[in-house]
C-alpha cells in the first residue's frame, strides 16, 4: 500500500517548504497543488475569463497540464517563476472558487496521487483530493507571521513589495479560500494540526516524519 501524506493550510503557513523537505527526506514524490491553481489562474486571466461565468469549461479545453519529476508543463512548455507573483496568487484564489476549475484540477491531482508514495500540499488535499491519506497534517500560523515569511520570500526573489500589502493580500486570500462553497480551506477531522508560528522548519519536518514513521512503518 502506498503512503500518501496530505499537508494543508493557509498561505504562508510553511506548507511548500515543509512538504518539499519531507518528500526529500523520505525520497518520495512531491506535489504542489497551489502551483496548479496558479497555472490555471494565470491562463484564465490572460484569456479574460469572467470568474462569475456559469461555465469556464471552454477556456480549460485547450489547457494540458503535465507533471513529470516534480515539474509542471503547460501544453509541453515548462512552467517558470511567472506563477509565483502575488498577482498570480490572487488569480489562483479567485478562479479556485469556480466549480469547473476545481473539477478540472481535482481530477488531475487524484490521478497523480493514485497508488504512489507522495507528499501533496494545498488547501483540500486531506478533505477532497486524498480523503483517505495515510497521514494528514494541517499547518497554521498567525497572519502576521505568515505575511512576514511571504514578504521576505518575495524580497529575496527581487520583488519590490510592502509588508502591509503582503499582509492584506494574505488576509484577503484566507477569506476567499475559507469562505468559498466548494472545497474550502478546512482542516480534515482526522488531520493533525501543527502551529508553525514559533517552530523552525526542521522542527516541523521532524514532527511530520515521526508521524509518517508511525503510520507507514512498513515503508520508512
Ligand atoms: O498554495 P498557494 O498559495 O500557491 O495557492 C494559491 C491559491 O490556490 C490559494 O490561495 C488557493 O486559492 C488555491 N488553492 C486551492 N486548493 C489547493 C491549492 C491551492 O484552492 N489545493
Regions found by a protein language model. Give the residues of each.
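ATP-dependent NMP and nucleoside kinases share a basic, alpha-helical "lid"
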Residues: 83-92, 96-157
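Small-molecule kinase domains that catalyze NTP-dependent phosphoryl transfer to phosphate-bearing small molecules
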Residues: 59, 69, 109-115, 123, ...
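P-loop (Walker A) phosphate-binding loop of NTP-binding proteins
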Residues: 10
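Residue-level signal for inorganic ion chemistry
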Residues: 34, 76, 105, 119, ...
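Conserved lysine of the Walker
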Residues: 15
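Hydrophobic anchor at the beta1->P-loop junction of P-loop NTPases
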Residues: 7
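Hydrophobic positions on the alpha1 helix immediately C-terminal to the Walker A/P-loop
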Residues: 18
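N-terminal phosphate/diphosphate-binding loop that engages ATP/GTP or pyrophosphate donors
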Residues: 24-86
Amino acid at each position: 500500500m502506498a503512503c500518501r501524506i496530505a499537508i494543508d493550510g493557509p498561505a504562508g503557513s510553511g506548507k511548500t517548504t515543509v512538504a518539499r523537505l519531507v518528500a526529500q527526506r523520505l525520497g518520495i514524490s512531491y506535489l504542489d497543488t497551489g502551483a496548479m491553481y496558479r497555472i490555471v489562474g494565470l491562463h484564465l486571466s490572460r484569456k479574460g475569463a469572467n470568474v462569475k461565468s456559469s461555465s469556464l469549461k471552454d477556456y480549460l479545453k485547450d489547457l494540458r497540464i503535465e507533471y513529470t519529476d516534480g515539474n509542471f508543463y503547460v501544453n509541453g512548455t515548462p512552467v517558470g517563476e511567472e506563477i509565483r507573483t502575488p498577482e498570480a496568487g490572487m488569480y489562483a484564489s479567485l478562479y479556485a472558487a469556480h466549480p469547473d476549475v476545481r473539477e478540472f484540477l481535482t481530477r488531475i491531482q487524484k490521478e497523480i496521487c493514485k497508488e504512489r508514495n507522495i507528499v501533496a500540499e494545498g488547501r483540500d488535499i486531506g478533505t477532497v483530493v486524498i480523503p483517505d491519506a495515510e497521514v494528514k497534517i494541517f499547518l497554521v500560523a498567525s497572519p502576521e507571521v505568515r505575511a512576514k515569511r511571504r514578504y521576505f520570500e518575495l524580497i529575496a526573489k527581487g520583488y519590490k513589495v510592502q509588508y502591509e500589502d503582503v499582509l492584506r493580500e494574505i488576509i484577503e486570500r484566507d477569506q476567499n479560500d475559507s469562505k468559498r462553497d466548494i472545497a474550502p480551506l478546512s482542516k480534515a477531522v482526522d488531520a493533525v494540526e501543527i502551529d508553525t508560528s514559533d517552530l523552525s522548519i526542521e522542527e516541523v519536518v521532524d514532527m511530520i516524519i515521526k508521524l509518517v514513521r508511525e503510520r507507514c512503518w512498513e515503508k520508512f
